């Protein structure tokens, strides 16, 4: 703290101090050959020390055992269903980190400077979507933008004066070298993130790295100038209002709000063959016209009426992981709450192995609700006759090719009465089912693409009985999207591709007009 005060005194010209997420580095281990061995951007294992363990015992009233962190060698990564002791440790660390960080922020303010945090590598204890974060008193948060999901990681943060996104590419030699193409990377990054910005804008944009490297790429500088101008117009038109949301969607997993937009990430926007089919759901939602929230099973146990203002619940991931819940489905309160929600008219979308956990004669614990089950070998003795496909369904109406399910799922079969939309080699990849007054959709996987984003959009509308509102603030071409800012009296149409596009655009009153768009173009209109 003394060094911080000294720095402030010796640098009066500095008016913003940007902290690199304060104290604890995420879990990162290397092997004897200096290769990365283990990485977990959300890991807490690097925050353990004798002092911390002593303080934990005093506050919580029980000893912290090594196994609470080691966790059979899985180190409680975010795919593991968190136990009580690990969640206690996380909450303890958040309180401890918040107290220390507040001291630093208070000193910063006393010295007449703003305090900004770079949300990233030292994020332990400073997760912005928990209540402790607001007590720190930060003025701003900045973070790296890799895609729409990581943009929403930043823009959805509450309790700060402004948020900022650091866009790619970084001004490093791996991109800015002879023969490099920084413009291509910049375009991909901006167009990908723009979808999310149009739903929840950050307040500022920027880049990082060695500035002098960019001087040798004048075409890059010109493109960045165009991005800045586009962002200014976007921000001016969208600020101060929530864009039109057609439905309210909740992503249900073991983490809930604390992992908002970050679920299915091992590291920041890092591709994994095993999870891209699930991460695509979150990426699609980041720029879709829905009011999205993230809820946990603990939230349901605390308040089973939490779903009262929700239209559709999504449970996505592999069985027995934190993303689908694992053994939590043995708790009758959880399964009853979801069944009641759907039976009374709610929508449910299960992706991968939703509610997957072998228990009481089922692998998918909501198999009766979803109308689909996984063949684990225990039911091979039962014949299965429901394999007919129903391709002329509302959900598939805009598809132009066979649906890309990514890795898909093997050994999924449908119960009688379930309507199969897609099965391949007698393995169900997509199906719909009625349950009481409600509806469910099963999808084996859905990597992010514009066409798959449209499939998810229609799935949400169908499961929520929302077919009638399809042609409101809507583009018939799935490569083009419409966002309406009704309070501000404006709406925009955006081409997400690098090619010209034609589409029919529907306004909020279902009137329409034809439109031709240049690559990447965004057009603004008065309502």
Name each region found by the language model.
Residues 305-313:
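Short acidic/histidine-rich motifs immediately flanking catalytic phosphotransfer sites
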Residues 2-3, 47-51, 89-106, 273-281, ...:
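Aromatic- and glycine-enriched glycan-recognition loops and surfaces
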Residues 5, 15-22, 26-30, 79-81, ...:
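Hydrophobic targeting/anchoring helices
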Residues 325-401:
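A glycine-rich, often tryptophan-bearing local segment used as a flexible ligand/cofactor-contacting loop or short
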Residues 112-113, 161, 344-347, 438:
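A short helix->loop->beta-strand "cap" motif at the edges of active sites that frequently abuts
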Residues 28-31, 38, 212-246, 286, ...:
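Extracellular ligand-binding/catalytic regions of CAZymes and related secreted enzymes
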Residues 22-78, 135, 267-268, 364-369:
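Aromatic- and acidic-residue-enriched segments that line the glycan-binding/catalytic groove
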Residues 117-126, 282-305:
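A short, well-structured beta->alpha microelement
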């Amino acid at each position: 703290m003394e060094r911080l005060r000294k720095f402030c005194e010796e640098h009066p010209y500095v008016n913003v101090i940007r902290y690199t997420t304060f104290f604890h580095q995420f879990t990162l281990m290397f092997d004897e050959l200096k290769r990365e061995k283990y990485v977990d951007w959300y890991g807490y294992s690097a925050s353990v020390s004798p002092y911390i363990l002593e303080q934990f015992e005093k506050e919580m009233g029980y000893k912290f055992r090594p196994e609470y962190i080691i966790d059979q060698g899985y180190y409680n990564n975010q795919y593991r269903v968190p136990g009580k002791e690990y969640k206690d440790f996380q909450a303890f660390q958040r309180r401890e980190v918040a107290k220390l960080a507040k001291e630093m922020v208070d000193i910063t303010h006393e010295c007449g400077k703003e305090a900004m945090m770079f949300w990233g590598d030292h994020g332990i204890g400073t997760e912005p979507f928990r209540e402790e974060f607001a007590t720190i008193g930060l003025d701003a948060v900045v973070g790296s933008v890799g895609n729409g999901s990581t943009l929403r990681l930043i823009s959805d943060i509450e309790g700060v004066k402004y948020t900022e996104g650091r866009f790619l590419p970084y001004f490093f030699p791996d991109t800015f070298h002879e023969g490099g193409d920084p413009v291509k990377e910049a375009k991909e990054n901006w167009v990908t993130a723009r979808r999310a910005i149009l739903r929840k804008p950050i307040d500022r944009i920027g880049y990082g790295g060695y500035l002098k490297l960019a001087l040798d790429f004048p075409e890059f500088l010109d493109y960045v100038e165009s991005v800045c101008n586009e962002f200014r117009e976007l921000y001016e038109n969208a600020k101060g209002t929530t864009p039109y949301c057609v439905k309210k969607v909740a992503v249900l997993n073991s983490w809930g709000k604390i992992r908002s937009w970050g679920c299915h990430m091992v590291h920041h926007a890092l591709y994994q063959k095993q999870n891209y089919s699930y991460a695509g759901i979150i990426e699609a939602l980041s720029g879709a016209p829905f009011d999205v929230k993230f809820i946990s099973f603990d939230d349901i146990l605390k308040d089973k009426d939490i779903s009262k203002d929700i239209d559709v619940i999504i449970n996505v991931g592999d069985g027995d992981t934190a993303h689908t819940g694992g053994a939590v489905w043995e708790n009758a309160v959880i399964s009853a709450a979801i069944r009641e929600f759907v039976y009374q008219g709610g929508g449910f979308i299960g992706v991968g192995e939703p509610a997957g956990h072998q228990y009481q004669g089922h692998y998918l614990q909501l198999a009766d609700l979803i109308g689909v089950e996984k063949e684990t070998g225990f039911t091979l003795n039962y014949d299965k006759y429901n394999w007919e496909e129903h391709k002329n369904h509302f959900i598939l109406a805009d598809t132009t090719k066979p649906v890309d399910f990514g890795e898909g799922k093997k050994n999924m079969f449908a119960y009688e009465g379930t309507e199969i939309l897609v099965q391949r080699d007698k393995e169900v990849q997509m199906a719909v089912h009625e349950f009481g007054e409600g509806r469910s959709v099963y999808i084996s996987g859905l990597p992010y693409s514009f066409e798959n984003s449209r499939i998810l959009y229609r799935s949400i509308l169908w499961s929520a009985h929302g077919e009638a509102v399809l042609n409101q603030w809507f583009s018939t071409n799935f490569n083009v999207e419409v966002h309406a800012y009704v309070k501000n009296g404006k709406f925009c149409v955006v081409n997400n591709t690098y090619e010209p596009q034609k589409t029919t655009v529907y306004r909020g009153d279902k009137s329409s007009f034809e439109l031709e768009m240049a690559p990447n173009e965004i057009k603004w209109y008065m309502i």
